[in-house]
């Protein structure tokens, strides 16, 4: 595994957004929502076509406020495709931020809520010299090594340059700085949150 322990904070071993998603079977075309495990048994969507400069906004309504992110299909088309697909299915609704490290990032998107779940499919990272972890408010994908991106994402609180070319940036915050501040205040050095931090609803405001 290429990730380091969540308790390590040395310069030699920078903390990383950790995802322990299983290398699950991507089969299963039908979505059986009555099945309580439906979020973990989805089929990977086909890559969508995007127009140059197309604006797609991902809105997260949480129990501490709302955030809006401009998605970056020109840089990370598969990640944006997957985000739209999962959002339209209701995948991210009622999912928590299970790991919030003050001075680092907030991580969510695991349907199991423990950092070990995913949508049932995995895909490769998408990297660009134009996308660097150089500021707060970036939306990036957690993983446990190459080819293990899924549904778990994180939002940066600070620049995190050691994550460049290891984690895919697929969006940037355009509103909701106060919500990010609230998330960070409810985090800790260990990643344990002081209260339940819930994504009540995720939606795509402008797409296609």
Per-segment meaning from a language model:
Residues 3-208:
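Cyclophilin-like peptidyl-prolyl cis-trans isomerases
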